[in-house]
Amino acid sequence: MKVLVIGNGGREHALAWKAAQSPLVETVFVAPGNAGTALEPTLQNVAIGVTDIPALLDFAQNEKVDLTIVGPEAPLVKGVVDTFRAAGMKIFGPTAGAAQLEGSKAFTKDFLARHNIPTAEYQNFTEVEPALAYLREKGAPIVIKADGLAAGKGVIVAMTLEEAEAAVHDMLAGNAFGDAGHRIVIEEFLDGEEASFIVMVDGEHVLPMATSQDHKRVGDKDTGPNTGGMGAYSPAPVVTDDVHQRTMERIIWPTVKGMASEGNTYTGFLYAGLMIDKQGNPKVIEFNCRFGDPETQPIMLRMKSDLVELCLAACEGKLDEKTSEWDERASLGVVMAAGGYPGDYRTGDVIHGLPLEEVEDGKVFHAGTKLADDEQVVTSGGRVLCVTALGHTVAEAQKRAYALMTDIHWDDCFCRKDIGWRAIEREQN
């Protein structure tokens, strides 16, 4: 069968790489893909942008694609799933209505409140003055979020009132996040440890994926501004069996049932960003309506199941007939980024030292890369590569990932040196 993966990041390289391992599959197309997918013998890039929905549908119909898997959020919010389904094409992802869970933070917070799903106390604002009054009433630390899609960067964790007020001005009066920031959510600062809890949903049944933990801040020990994610590992030891059960009972099931009851039946990957307190109680920080990036990369490295088989079962409403199998080992991915990210950065730098053949128990997934006219791999984004490895412990996986990246370099590249530090501290204790 033929599979189409929509997207051009590290997540899509990992999903397409995993899909191509399925015995059911003869061809995997990636639209538009990147240099990593271009260089994979089992994958084929297609030059169509992720939000060019008519062109994506045309291609899928002409090529008789049997299954489409959507990577990024933008086409989901624009209704790619609705369009494909209306044309009778099999596609795994949520409808535009269901994708509001990521497309609007205000929608999500109101939804969580309606269904008594644990989350931070909050209020939505469109005007500066009432927002500032609320800040002064609540005090810092406090969290300010742009309502719409901001590539994972529209969240300011303000440790002082001045910082919080500046963020409100930037978003509502300034134009820090364009349309995404015309409405903001201000919410209480939650203490605890974060985890990424990702499941597959077929509208009614849920199949949990492996747990993971992302590293949002740009600097070591979680300092500096938020990014799309600087690295991740799986599994996340903070998600104990108890926490797993609580998350399913208090968050995932009520969300799936609540969406269905409101006429937005959810199918696709559902990613709950959790904050877990000292007592092991999870609260929702955010929902994403797709797999996380960079969490996908270490999770796919651990996945033993057939991803395509699971997606097909989900499209047919038969996820309850499937289980997922995982490598017992831990896996860890480190993002190599362009200097200046998440602010302004340069593109077009030649990347040296990429491994020429497959690495045992490791993989270099490409994100912001492209093939130049002379076939050299050059940078084309802020997050450029995700260097991922397996190990019997998180510490061993970390050591292997950093070793795998030793020879890879370009002008002004950087990475965090401490990905996995929370899990490694746990292992040492």
From Swiss-Prot:
Mg(2+) binds at E286, N288. It is an enzyme of class 6 (ligase). Binds 1 Mg(2+) or Mn(2+) ion per subunit. InterPro entries: ATP-grasp, ATP_grasp_subdomain_1, PreATP-grasp_dom_sf, PRibGlycinamid_synth_ATP-grasp, PRibGlycinamide_synth, PRibGlycinamide_synth_C-dom, PRibGlycinamide_synth_C_sf, PRibGlycinamide_synth_CS. Pfam families: GARS_A (PF01071), GARS_C (PF02843), GARS_N (PF02844). It catalyses: 5-phospho-beta-D-ribosylamine + glycine + ATP = N(1)-(5-phospho-beta-D-ribosyl)glycinamide + ADP + phosphate + H(+). Its cofactor is Mg(2+); Mn(2+). Pathway: Purine metabolism; IMP biosynthesis via de novo pathway; N(1)-(5-phospho-D-ribosyl)glycinamide from 5-phospho-alpha-D-ribose 1-diphosphate: step 2/2. Residues 212-237 are annotated as: Disordered. GO terms for biological process: 'de novo' IMP biosynthetic process; purine nucleobase biosynthetic process. Residues 213-223 have a biased composition (Basic and acidic residues). ATP binds at residues 135-196. Keywords: ATP-binding, Ligase, Magnesium, Manganese, Metal-binding, Nucleotide-binding, Purine biosynthesis. Its EC number is 6.3.4.13. Monomer. This is Phosphoribosylamine--glycine ligase. The lineage of its organism: Bacteria, Pseudomonadati, Pseudomonadota, Gammaproteobacteria, Enterobacterales.
